[in-house]
Amino acid sequence: MDYKETLNLPSTEFSMRANLVKKEPEMLKKWKEMDDYNLVLKSREGKPKFVLHDGPPYANGNIHIGTATNKILKDIVIRYKTMRGYYAPYVPGWDTHGLPIEHRVSVEMGEKIKEMSPVEIRQKCKDFALNFVNIQREQFKRLGVRGDWDNPYLTLDPKYETHILNIFKTLVKNGNVYRGNKPVYWCPTCKTALAEAEVEYHDHSSPSIYVKFKLIGEENTYVVIWTTTPWTLPANVAIAVHPEYDYVKIKVDGEYWIVAEGLLNKFAAETEINYEVVEKFKGKDLEYKKAKHPFIDRESLIVLADYVTLEDGTGCVHTAPGHGAEDYLTGLKYNLPVLSPVNEEGIFTEEAGKYAGLKIWDANKVIIEDLEKLGALIKTQKIEHSYPHCWRCKNPIIFRATPQWFISVDKNNLREKVLEEIKKVEWHPKWGENRITAMVKERPDWTISRQRVWGTPIPAIKCKHCGEVFIDEKVIDSFITIVEKEGTDAWFKLPEKEIIPEDVKCPKCGHNEFEKTYDTLDVWIDSGCSFEAVIRSKGEKFPVDLYLEGDDQHRGWFQSSIFMSVAHTGQAPYKSVVTHGFIKDEHGRKMSKSLGNVIDPKEIVDKYGADILRLWVSSIDFFDNIRVGKNIIQQQVEVYKKIRNTLRFLLGNLSNFTKNDLVEFDKLLPLDKWALGRLQEVISQVTEHYEKYEFSKVYSLINRYCTVELSATYLDILKDRLYVEAKDSIYRRSAQTVMFYILDALIKMLAPVLVFTTEEAYQLSPLKEFDTVHLEYWPQVRKEFVDEKLMEEFKILFMVRDDVLKALENARKNDIIGHSLDAKVTLNGVNEQINNVLVKYKDYLEEIFIVSQVEIGEGKVKGEFANVSVEKASGEKCQRCWKYSEETGKDEEYPNTCPRCAAVLKGLRK
């Protein structure tokens, strides 16, 4: 007789092959038809709110691995919180103004852009941005990210723009906005000012020169400066020294040079000079002395500055207030002129004399040659150093003094208020607080004006009579009213008389004829106002629960948001901030096209499915820098297969099981009680990790639970009972009851991550109660399922099991047995406690060890917890269950079966 037909073999439509690439789009279609986002929200109406506010990515290209990771992390949080019973909306947004988009449009339009009006350029930018909003929206949806995709927030939306202008008005009203001729980061390529957050640092090769400035009033005496920007020397008006440092006058070939004593050895080594120290004095003794500029007919004042260091150079710092932030502040203190003879394209103006018309980078060489001819050059060489570059065009930038609009970060104690609010926020990881605190403490005033057309216009006007440029609250109010109906294009379209109220007067001369100015706001103002435009104005919970972005946003969106919010509302816009690191390749290198190590999320999704990408995101300790590559993704494919196979085994063995078949805890078999108790521990630990946003710990725990504790242990042990015992016997139903609870918990714990796979499993499972798994609630820890004494006893049993498995493996190597069911095990515990446990559970040891026979007796091989002997099992092999028994073959009706199998087949074993 073929006994295979009498076994309870697994049966499920949940295939071993995932085929996610085909199935996922089908599920997305189904979710769209059921309007899953609103369906889920409706199911949580009246529940406590959890609001994660989405930081807007730029709508200027396809999503990349960084934006994909960010959105998936947010989606995991939202889905988890929803399952915990929160009303957790998710409104995605896009940053749609600014230089990144205008730069792309400029490149696409080429020379044509010079003939286009501002309104035409803005329309092209708008079209460009909206196109990529649509592209990115579909790409994010394909990742399984659930949100209000039909109603995102866009910074170009007129309603949004009115909120920007209202907050700007608050800043104006509070006196935080001012106009100044200060040096700012300037991109000569993009021809605009940049804020700190728009600056990147890359390696750059620069000339390094030592230059002599002749000291006036002292014969043959020179102050030596060092600079890596020779092109700024035409703007030099001072030399800064540290008041408390020691300086020396050294004799070199009949001349006297002044340098800091702390840098003398380094300076002498680099310049290869022989010298003699003739005098020593403090830096403060040099204050107000004057030196002669080496190639321009003017004097350079010696001034004091605490920022002078002894790291490089000579301790005598070339100072040009028009080309440096610290230089500018020193210039204010000493009433120095602010010279910046460079135009918007980085070309010298007439003010630079003989260098007029030269590009600043080309001028370096000419200036060095002139210094050499004049005998002022001591040494020149090339150095590689970290230098600021434009975030958009990636070209080197400069400091350039131009009239700009600024936000004073100290007016009305704004900086101090922000620092106080930072302390109230919960930062993950904790070092995030120190990082943003240091940045806020050190940050200069905020340059908010941009010389571009694609942005929110700064409603500043210029008096036609005296040239005064100013901002009037009445003009802002008038413009806001217009923007509500027409958008900010109106600033570029409408004549002044339709925007500027008649009663506006010039604060300087009293006249009332004006023209508009056309600077636009820094885009960090735009996105920094999202707390008002998206949250407060719509009556959402404020402050929100969470901001979650890359750690570069400590100087970006986190900072712009808290400054705007504190200025407007007096408090931080967020309760908690979670940051993730930068994404690098699997070797820790930055991704770049030239290295060929760029990982495209679309390629992963198209090849493996979005759930594989999501599983990878859950696997990373994202608080640190993140690594990804083809090998790492392939590892996730293997992990996914193990998780999927665990789900498949559970589903296959629950195919005929319903909730009516559940066995009460007290009636469960001991092994099943242990497994159910262990499940409660897993649920508790997984929940704790989710709460702390430690998704990599969730991943590791569930991965180990599925592969080691379930597939390789508990489920492996259960196969005999599941397949061999009677379909509805207590032996099988006890196992199925626990498998039911495990499947329920596993699907729910994995649902925030494997959104597609868990949906597929849920639809085929006996635990389905809702139309989608994503309407389900989080599994609860049930203490009534934990028998503490039994859990401790099984801890001992599994330690003994490890010793038994080692002994079985040795027996297999020595050809004593083939399969473990060929074995008889004799064992005893190494102490009385272990032995008592073995005796107590002796009737279950065959099952736990997956052997045919177990005897409590003297084992020959010493183990850590038990002494174990393995020999060939006695009797004959049952053709149905493959276990050996001396009673096998004695049943006439079912020959070749053991007594247990014969009883099952006769319906006698229930």
From Swiss-Prot:
GO molecular function per UniProt? aminoacyl-tRNA deacylase activity; ATP binding; isoleucine-tRNA ligase activity; tRNA binding; zinc ion binding
The keyword Oxidoreductase belongs to this UniProt entry's keyword annotation: no
Q: Which cofactor does it need?
A: Zn(2+)
The EC code for this enzyme is: 6.1.1.5
User: What keywords are assigned to this protein?
Assistant: Aminoacyl-tRNA synthetase, ATP-binding, Cytoplasm, Ligase, Metal-binding, Nucleotide-binding, Protein biosynthesis, Zinc
The enzyme's main class, written as a single word, is ligase
| UniProt motif ('HIGH' region) ranges | 57-67
- Record motif 'KMSKS' region, residues: 590-594
Question: What reaction(s) does this enzyme catalyze?
Answer: tRNA(Ile) + L-isoleucine + ATP = L-isoleucyl-tRNA(Ile) + AMP + diphosphate
Q: Which domain of life is it from?
A: Bacteria
Q: Does the keyword tRNA-binding apply?
A: no
Pfam families according to UniProt: Anticodon_1, tRNA-synt_1, zf-FPG_IleRS
The Gene Ontology biological process annotation of the record reads: isoleucyl-tRNA aminoacylation
User: How and how many cofactors are bound, per the record note?
Assistant: Binds 1 zinc ion per subunit.
Residues at which ATP binds: 593
GO cellular component term of the entry, any: cytosol
Places the protein is found: Cytoplasm
List of residues binding L-isoleucyl-5'-AMP: 549
Describe the subunit structure: Monomer.
**What does the function comment of this entry state?**
Catalyzes the attachment of isoleucine to tRNA(Ile). As IleRS can inadvertently accommodate and process structurally similar amino acids such as valine, to avoid such errors it has two additional distinct tRNA(Ile)-dependent editing activities. One activity is designated as 'pretransfer' editing and involves the hydrolysis of activated Val-AMP. The other activity is designated 'posttransfer' editing and involves deacylation of mischarged Val-tRNA(Ile).
Family named by the database record? Belongs to the class-I aminoacyl-tRNA synthetase family. IleS type 1 subfamily.
Record's domain comment?
Answer: IleRS has two distinct active sites: one for aminoacylation and one for editing. The misactivated valine is translocated from the active site to the editing site, which sterically excludes the correctly activated isoleucine. The single editing site contains two valyl binding pockets, one specific for each substrate (Val-AMP or Val-tRNA(Ile)).
Q: Which PANTHER family match?
A: ISOLEUCINE--TRNA LIGASE, MITOCHONDRIAL, SOLEUCYL-TRNA SYNTHETASE
Q: What is this protein called?
A: Isoleucine--tRNA ligase
Q: Which organism is it from?
A: Thermosipho africanus (strain TCF52B)
Q: Which gene specifies this protein's sequence?
A: ileS
